[in-house]
């Protein structure tokens, strides 16, 4: 007799849910397991926050525009999907960034990594922070390490090692630009544990970075243009990030994909789970995988797991808008010889950052055009649209 067919339900059609469905499909096929895979997505499209809009010769990213190419699991997935040849790197000629100060875009000093200088000469030559701020940052070279390595916020770590000016003018906008969050609320261990490890091992973050980068054969030549984030670690696809999610979907052969299908309740049965879809259909399944982490999850699992419901209820969810602007080259006075710029909170602007998308990756716009992508907090959207000088 054939064993009873099992059913696995995956909730959420973003990159996590899609990848899980694809990997389970592979596993069940390889081991000839009699299991049905159902993937439900509440919206009319797959991909979650990964969304690329293509208009004529324009490639516009509404969500993330890149991924870390240092993650082996991502590259392995691309290889299995046969899209590794479609991966493109950032422009090697402009792997640096700027920080807004007043009305000027100041280059991040060459050889500067997120919160710490590596190359000392360019750092002291930069007008980004005052001479007193630079001296305070150099105290990292002599400050003792912490005796106890309990977690602390990114804000506390930066101020302790490098001072308040370094945080306000450099670390806050650069780290905030990555996570779109307040560094005072971000865990150091959860976001940038490498800096804690550098302090623990080398005492000085600056010395630790220099030794680590040299060991990895990183270029510390002070004439190098590289600064800010390590842009060589970012990559995308020739036709945008949706290449990845569409390629996963195209590989589905035994996945029951259901769009416009919102989970409205989850109930535990004696054997398995009863999942209500759109308040009018019940799916009886053996396993449920929740990949859509949003505020509604807490309500859905309140009865079946009060502990995890309480955990999700404590999570803060931020919202960010991305706005694509297309200009003719002659309209922009700046040379755009970098990947983009970030905006410190102390500048009191309505935007968090701006990416020079058509410089960052090739073939995003027709010849003669420029594509800039601006990041705005949801709370600042009204101010941004109402003010002519929003930028």
Could you describe each region identified by the protein language model?
Residues 96, 135-265:
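Active-site/ligand-binding neighborhood in enzyme catalytic cores
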Residues 259-387:
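Mid-domain catalytic core of redox enzymes
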Residues 70, 160-161, 291-292:
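Short, well-ordered coil/turn residues at beta-beta hairpins
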Residues 16, 45, 295:
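Conserved Rossmann-like nucleotide-cofactor binding loop
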Residues 56-145:
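Dinucleotide-binding Rossmann-like beta1-alpha1 core, especially the glycine-rich loop
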Residues 25-54:
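Glycine-rich FAD pyrophosphate-binding loop
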Residues 22, 26-29, 52, 250, ...:
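Short, well-ordered alpha-helices that flank and scaffold nucleotide-derived cofactor binding pockets
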Residues 2-16:
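Beta1/beta-strand and adjacent pyrophosphate-binding region of the FAD-binding site
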